[in-house]
Design a protein with these regions (language model features):
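Hydrophobic anchor at the beta1->P-loop junction of P-loop NTPases
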Residues: 8
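P-loop (Walker A) phosphate-binding loop of NTP-binding proteins
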Residues: 11
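Conserved lysine of the Walker
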Residues: 16
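N-terminal phosphate/diphosphate-binding loop that engages ATP/GTP or pyrophosphate donors
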Residues: 21-68
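Phosphate-binding/switch loop-helix module in NTP-utilizing enzymes
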Residues: 66-115
Length: 177
């Protein structure tokens, strides 16, 4: 099986999303989503999902009883649509930043995560460093390169990812600036 997807993992605040941001700055266009902080509650934050195609966002977590909990409906509706739009788009590159615990009960969303990974699209996905069944299955896929920023330097990961994408996207007819 040919490797074409790129997974990035590592402990909290190690630079996973910054790495993705630096990599995609080199591209003309891409589909998918990123997760961004919405509201800060001391040491913890709620989050929203931002759709790169439609340039819209929706909350994916909320603060309840002194803890942050996911909003499964956000993944089953907005998240699912975001990934479906990515599949239907002309973009060769799809970003999923990040996959974690909030969406683990959203079967519709997880179905489309797998559809995107199984598609001809090239995926860059940030994977939360937690032992969650669906995340472990993704990390063990044979069609993925896995970069653990706890084990490889940011610079080395960046250089290798850019190199791999140059090769992969040349096959697709796209190019990096």
């Amino acid at each position: 099986m040919e490797k074409k997807n790129i997974l990035i993992t590592g402990r909290k605040n190690v630079g996973k999303s910054i790495l993705v941001k630096r990599v995609i700055e080199q591209f003309h266009g891409y589909a998918g989503f990123k997760t961004v902080p919405l509201k800060n509650y001391g040491l913890i934050s709620t989050y929203q999902m931002y759709d790169f195609i439609n340039k819209t966002s929706i909350p994916i977590s909320k603060y309840v009883d002194n803890k942050i909990v996911g909003i499964p409906e956000s993944f089953s509706t907005f998240g699912k649509k975001c990934l479906k739009n990515a599949l239907d788009s002309n973009y060769s590159l799809v970003i999923m930043d990040e996959l974690g615990r909030f969406e683990r009960t959203s079967r519709d969303f997880l179905y489309y995560v797998n559809e995107v990974l199984n598609s001809d699209k090239i995926v860059i996905a940030v994977i939360k460093a937690e032992k969650i069944d669906y995340l472990e299955k993704i990390k063990n896929r044979k069609d993925c390169y896995l970069y653990d920023l706890d084990e490889v330097s940011f610079v080395k990961a960046y250089q290798e990812i850019i190199f791999r994408l140059n090769v992969l996207l040349t096959w697709e007819g796209d190019k990096i600036d």
